[in-house]
Amino acid sequence: MSFSVQIKHELATNPLIKTEWSSFLAGYFQNGLKLLATGQWSFKTSTATLKALFSNALQFSFQIHETSTHCEFSFRASQTEVDQLLAFDATQSDLPLQKAYVIGAFLSGGSVSDLLHSSNFHLQISTNNELQIKQLMKLFHPFKQTTKRHQLLVYVKSYQAICDFFKLVEAFDGYLAFEENQLQKNFALEQVRKSNLEIANLMRTLKTSTSTAEQLKILINSADFKKQSLNFQRFCLVKLDHPDWSLEQIAQFFERKYKVQITRSGIQHLNAKLKKLNQN
């Protein structure tokens, strides 16, 4: 089951549909209702949940024709009843009716990309009813309007806008699944970023250590090295053997190995002298 079908299944079971049935029906019919040559009205559903919904709640006498891809309902109703639904303006209604209308519009012509397995954020409602397009633009301000393959549609392509739409139509299961998936993706990306940063820092450290070691070897093998103080010579040899030691560890080693007590500032002085000689 695709993520889009999951969302439609959740919306089709929303209690608002039953309590605000006329508004929902207007949202659905303004999108896909057709007048047949027989004088009957016809609309299609694409999921078993929608088929069950209309089979149980549709108040008109109807027939069902099923294919491998959809289920087509045909029914008879007075022109007045149908005109009222097709002319319904949800923007003049209260919030529950507006939500039911948008749910109907989405169930009729809406789709959403596979937000759980793709980075492509896209939600749209397609319809050739200009009245419906205008209403949807007013009812959900982030919507943008375009035409694709001679079909009018409204759409959003941002993570936040899709989350807001799910909250508007009360698709809370879909919203939470989408939100959790994004948190997991963001966490994974953050871990990769941290790992890359740690690797970069390690490479810089290794490069610096290698450079320092080469400089130390050159200094130790030079004639000037033997002219330096004994403590400085010892310091250089310790730095060569233990490049990762802190100044405090070197001071402790001096006391343990050479029985020489040297302060931290003394070690810092030797380290500064080494840097100065390397620069020269």
Curated annotation (Swiss-Prot):
Q: Does the keyword Iron-sulfur apply?
A: no
Q: Which GO terms describe its biological process?
A: cell division; regulation of sporulation
Q: Does the keyword Amino-acid biosynthesis apply?
A: no
Where's DNA bound on this chain?
Answer: 246-279
Q: Which UniProt keywords apply?
A: Cell cycle, Cell division, DNA-binding
Give the coiled coil ranges: none
This chain's function reads: Involved in cell division and chromosome segregation.
Similarity annotation: Belongs to the WhiA family.
Protein name in UniProt: Probable cell division protein WhiA
**Native source organism of the sequence:** Mycoplasma pneumoniae (strain ATCC 29342 / M129 / Subtype 1)
